[in-house]
Design a protein with these regions (language model features):
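Glycine-rich FAD pyrophosphate-binding loop
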Residues: 25-45
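A short alpha-helix-loop-beta-strand transition element characteristic
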Residues: 41-43, 72-89, 165, 319-327
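Short hydrophobic core segments
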Residues: 9-11, 141-153, 309
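Beta1/beta-strand and adjacent pyrophosphate-binding region of the FAD-binding site
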Residues: 2-16
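A conserved short coil-to-beta-strand element within the FAD-binding core of flavoproteins
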Residues: 117-131
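Dinucleotide-binding Rossmann-like beta1-alpha1 core, especially the glycine-rich loop
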Residues: 47-95, 103, 107, 111, ...
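Active-site substrate-recognition segment that forms the wall
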Residues: 152-289
Length: 343
């Protein structure tokens, strides 16, 4: 077994894991960030949209409405991360271009001193005062503290997390570059029906899906979508047949208002990824009874994660009084997990 020197091991190198790693490094904490080597992540195919006003009356939504300022501060500290102001009515919005974010995260994490490793985590094993991770290839690491921030991948490592997390599949069309000198407009649905579908996930007796027709700039191209598919009860599943799901998405786009309707026949690659959602509506950020920490289940991750990552870093690594204060704040925001132990 390799006894990792990292003070904190984070499983998942998407938005949640990366911003938590940066927040921990600001506190001088050694960090090992483990990311599976294959496939797109939910971060890669996210719209990256950040509303500038609260979308519900919860304390978290009120605080997350200021996320654009946090992104601006992150970019002043680390350089361009893809955050851009966007013109959109009736709501003030900004967006993180996830193509640019993906290009920049690796170098930014390296510059911050985060140890990054491409390796799939196969299993967790409790051992003494820390958890050991079995990695693909036979290696084992045992960081002093462990955070699961791998989205839907968390469910494969700790099945009991299904009490608080469900799985959906998100499908989008990755569109080719727009005409020279042009870019795709940002068009969002007036409401996201995905949230209502997730809210009734436990009652689903068969798979169900919805399409929230929208379009965002994505690198030089665009993302059109989004299809959301849930298995019965929102359980872990292999997802829908991609060809069939692409047909559902294109049919829904064809009935949407212009300019979305024209995208129904557009060239573009259909892509789908598993996504973790919170069964209680609020994300989960905190320590489980068995000692593993969880950072997952976001609704609007690009607004919620930048707010919560520094608080979770403080709860993990600050001196006792400051750590307790951070935990109280996470509890007040309603995100501290109330789940039984992993293992």
């Amino acid at each position: 077994m390799v006894d990792a020197d990292a003070g904190v091991g984070i499983v998942g190198g998407g938005l949640a894991g990366a911003l938590l790693a940066l927040a921990l490094r600001e506190r001088g904490v050694p960090v090992l960030l483990l990311e599976a080597a294959d496939g797109a992540s939910a971060t890669d195919l996210s719209y990256g949209v950040i509303p500038g006003i609260p979308l519900d009356p919860s304390p978290l939504a009120r605080r997350a409405a200021a996320a654009a300022r946090i992104w601006q501060a992150l970019q002043r500290r680390h350089g361009d991360l893809g955050w851009r102001p966007r013109r959109s009515l009736p709501l003030p919005l900004s967006q993180v271009d996830t193509v640019r974010l993906k290009q920049r995260l690796g170098p930014v994490l390296a510059a911050a001193g985060v140890e990054q490793r491409r390796a799939r985590v196969l299993a967790l094993q409790p051992g003494g005062d820390r958890w050991a991770l079995s990695l693909e290839g036979g290696e084992r690491v045992a960081p002093a503290r462990l955070v699961l921030a791998a989205g839907a991948g968390c469910l494969a490592l700790a099945a009991e997390l299904t009490a608080g997390l469900g799985m959906s599949w998100a499908g989008v069309l990755a569109l080719p570059p727009a005409a020279a000198g042009a870019s795709y407009p940002l068009k969002l649905p007036t409401r996201f029906t995905r949230l209502a579908l997730e809210g009734r996930a436990r009652a689903l007796q068969q798979p169900a899906w919805v399409v929230d027709a929208g379009l965002v700039p994505w690198g030089e191209g665009g993302l059109a979508g989004q299809l959301s598919w849930l298995a019965a009860s929102g359980a872990v599943s292999a997802g829908p047949d991609p060809a069939q799901a692409e047909g559902w998405l294109r049919h829904a786009l064809a009935t949407a208002p212009a300019p979305l309707a024209a995208l129904a026949a557009a060239s573009g690659d259909y892509r789908q990824v598993p996504v973790a959602f919170s069964r209680h509506g609020l994300p989960l950020a905190g320590r489980l009874p068995g000692g593993v920490w969880l950072f997952s289940g976001f609704r609007g991750a690009f607004a919620q994660v930048p707010l919560l990552a520094p608080l979770l870093a403080a709860a993990l690594a600050a001196p006792a009084a400051a750590a307790a204060a951070a935990e109280r704040e996470l509890r007040q925001l309603g995100v501290w997990p109330a789940l039984r132990a992993a293992g």
